[in-house]
Structure formats: structure tokens, C-alpha cells
Amino acid sequence: MGLWGQSVPTASSARAGRYPGARTASGTRPWLLDPKILKFVVFIVAVLLPVRVDSATIPRQDEVPQQTVAPQQQRRSLKEEECPAGSHRSEYTGACNPCTEGVDYTIASNNLPSCLLCTVCKSGQTNKSSCTTTRDTVCQCEKGSFQDKNSPEMCRTCRTGCPRGMVKVSNCTPRSDIKCKNESAASSTGKTPAAEETVTTILGMLASPYHYLIIIVVLVIILAVVVVGFSCRKKFISYLKGICSGGGGGPERVHRVLFRRRSCPSRVPGAEDNARNETLSNRYLQPTQVSEQEIQGQELAELTGVTVELPEEPQRLLEQAEAEGCQRRRLLVPVNDADSADISTLLDASATLEEGHAKETIQDQLVGSEKLFYEEDEAGSATSCL
């Protein structure tokens, strides 16, 4: 009886009791509220989610190194294939472009985007070598200046000499100034010290253009002095010769008696020869005033030992006498019949001592002062008497 009082479960209710989520008598779902189940679900989600994220990022990490390795390999290949000296690598095409002669250059293999510009020499510098595609311009200081590490930007003028008590041991170069050393140290090393007056170098003397003008003026003055001195020397010699000949230097007081000595076969002249000899003697005894030009010519001839003759009547008569083969010799005889041995001995001694010029001068002086005269004897010899 009691069994009939209980309700029999139906089929629907039986199916509901088999599935989860079936409600209990109180109407709740006990498995959703269980904290153990919730923890388990959270743990599973927390573990599986990072694993999927890591698996998704692994291919991307593999791709990044591949992208970064490519530029490094490219740089390595470019370094191995550098452009040669005298060219550069184009940043657009990557090809090697040559530099321009005289404009830019490169001195070694490179991958520069452009060539280096050539250096332009500054003021005070000279171009030692021009710029090429593989070499820069080489500049150096002009002569008389230098450039060292203390003045790399400009050339400085070299010193022209050393201070007092020092001597120069090396000249100025484009890279250094003159070098000086103590005089005592230079003498101890065996080098001859320079004098104090010669400290100034030739370079310093020629630095000013006025020195050339001074040298030219000095040469002209020296040449003028030589010319004037040579001209005055001739006149001075002529004046001295006039004084020595007894004329007092004046041409109007200078008298010359020219005579010759000819050697011919001696013979006794006839009456006609005696008359001609007397005529010649009279002509020679007459003082002849000659011009200044003739006197100078005679004096110059006397200096050289040459007999000077007047190309007039005496010359013609002498030539005529020579054609007849006569011999005439003049002797100096005193006018007052004094002994002529002393005078003749003096004249012969002068001739013996090779002073023929002095002998002729003495004869001319004595004849001009009328202390002697020429006399011709019958044997054809002429005697000059005092």
C-alpha cells in the first residue's frame, strides 16, 4: 500500500536524471558550482594559450635573421670588390666611376661615394707637382721661405743671417729655416766659422731689385774711369816727353833734328857729293818746328825704339843720297874746339848700355841749345861740333 503512494518516475524524468545539468530537488546544478572544476578549466586554458602563441611566432623569428644577414653579406661582397685608386663607387648604380684629372682624386682602393677634391696651392707657394686622379697636388714654399710644423698654414720668410757669435751650418729649405750654431761649437767640430761681415747671405742681398741697379751703375762708373784714365795717360806721356826733350812742354819750343845712320860701301865723294852733303847738313841744322801731332808721333816712336821721319824734303834727299851709295856719319864736335872725347865717350856709353833713346835725346838737346853742331869730314863722315 505504501508503494502505491509513491509517484512512479516517468520516462522523461528518467532521461533527465541521466544527463548533466539535471536539476536536483532543490532546482540547482551542483557541477557548475564545484570550485575544483573551475580551477581545472582555468589551468587548462592558461597552459594551452601560451603554447599556441609560441607556435605562431616561431616562423616569424626564423624569418628575421634571414632578412638581417643579407645586408651584411652585401657589405662583405662590396668590400671584397672595392673600386681601384683613381675612381669611386656610385651610390646609385654601384659601379666604379673614374675621377677627373686635375679636379679630384683617390689614392687607394675605396668605396667612397665621390672622389676627393685636389688641393690648390696658397699664396707664397709654388706647384711642385700637379694633381692627378691618383695623387693630390704637392705644394712647397717659394725660394727664401719655409713651412714647418709650427706654421703649417702659411710660409714664413727665412732669416738672412745668424745672430752675433753664431755661424750658419745649413741653408734655408722649403721645410726649414737656416740653422745656426755657436762659433765655439762650430770651431770645435772643425768647421771654419764665417766672418761677421759675411753673415748676410746672397739671397738677402738679391731680395731687393735695387741691388741690380747699383751693380750696373758701379760698372758704368768703372768703365768711364778706365777710358778717361787711358786718354789722360797719353796726354801726360806727351807732356813729360816734351819736358825731357827740353821744350818745356810747349810744342812751339820743341825742335827736332832727325838723322839716319845708313851703312853703305865707303867711298871718297867727289866735288858734287861734297856739295850735296853740305846742302843736307845745312838743312838738318835748321830748326824745324813741327806740329803737335808730329811731335806726339815721334815721341811714341821713340818709346818703341823706332826712328820717326818727316815725309818731306829731308826724306826725299836722304833717299836720293842712299841711291848713290854714300855713307854719312855725324859726329858731335864742340863749338869752342874743346875736347869732344868726353861727350863722345858719354854718348857711346849710353849706346852700349842700350840707352839709344837717351843718346838721341842728349844729341837733340845739345844741338838745339847750339852747343854742338854736326860736321862732315872729307872721308864722308859728319861731325857735330860744340
UniProtKB/Swiss-Prot annotation:
Q: What processes in GO biological process is this protein linked to?
A: apoptotic process; negative regulation of apoptotic process; signal transduction
Q: Which InterPro entries does the entry link to? A: TNFR/NGFR_Cys_rich_reg (IPR001368), TNFR_10 (IPR020465), TNFRSF10 (IPR052491), TNFRSF10_N (IPR034024)
Q: Which residues lie on this side of the membrane: Cytoplasmic?
A: 233-386
CDD domains named among the record's database cross-references: TNFRSF10 (cd10580)
Q: Glycosylated at which positions?
A: 127, 182
Question: Residue ranges of region Disordered?
Answer: 1-25, 62-90
Q: Which residues form the Death domain?
A: 340-366
PROSITE patterns, sorted = TNFR_NGFR_1, TNFR_NGFR_2
Q: For this UniProt entry, which residues form the secretion signal? A: 1-55
Looking at the UniProt entry, the stretches that span the membrane are 212-232
Q: Where is the composition biased (Polar residues)?
A: 64-75
Reported tissue expression:
Widely expressed, in particular in fetal kidney, lung and liver, and in adult testis and liver. Also expressed in peripheral blood leukocytes, colon and small intestine, ovary, prostate, thymus, spleen, pancreas, kidney, lung, placenta and heart.
Establish whether keyword rRNA-binding is in the entry: no
Query: Disulfide connectivity?
Result: 83-96, 99-115, 118-131, 121-139, 141-155, 158-172, 162-180
Main localization category: membrane
User: Does the record bear Coiled coil in its keywords?
Assistant: no
Side Extracellular, residues = 56-211
What is a single molecular function from GO for this protein? Answer: TRAIL binding
Q: Whereabouts are the TNFR-Cys repeats?
A: 58-97, 98-139, 140-180
Location in the cell reads: Membrane
Keywords recorded for this protein, A-Z = Apoptosis, Disulfide bond, Glycoprotein, Membrane, Receptor, Repeat, Signal, Transmembrane, Transmembrane helix
Gene Ontology cellular component? cell surface; plasma membrane
Q: How is the protein disposed in the membrane?
A: Single-pass type I membrane protein
The protein's role, per its UniProt record: Receptor for the cytotoxic ligand TRAIL. Contains a truncated death domain and hence is not capable of inducing apoptosis but protects against TRAIL-mediated apoptosis. Reports are contradictory with regards to its ability to induce the NF-kappa-B pathway. According to PubMed:9382840, it cannot but according to PubMed:9430226, it can induce the NF-kappa-B pathway.
What is the recorded name of this protein? Tumor necrosis factor receptor superfamily member 10D
Gene this protein is translated from: TNFRSF10D
